[in-house]
């Protein structure tokens, strides 16, 4: 259940691959959360042959008049059994929709940090979790300044 949104469904997806190389992980899973019936509707349309890609792409166009939100919960359990949870939530605003704000702002903040310190990382592709902890803290604060709600450890807004 998502607070203030109600019951949701979740299905396994793959977006944690960078953690395999950056954090000592024994087991991990990622679920995408959607309204009840969401995935089954698309399975049924696909299986019946009525899934229209052109119509689907038109529906994916951003419409600032359509309210939307992004909600993410990250739970981690340490080897000693300690658990921590972070919740990220955004409802979008005039400058973009919520998913772009929750993911794109991270990239934007990383670029700002890199421009200020080009020697921070060697050339290549780097996941945000490979950044120094003080950089991650600044990125979290930038996201909070932009109105993205982040609740959990290390999210004190200074």
Give the positions of each predicted feature:
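C-terminal catalytic/substrate-binding lobe primarily of soluble NAD(P)-dependent oxidoreductases
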Residues: 1-158
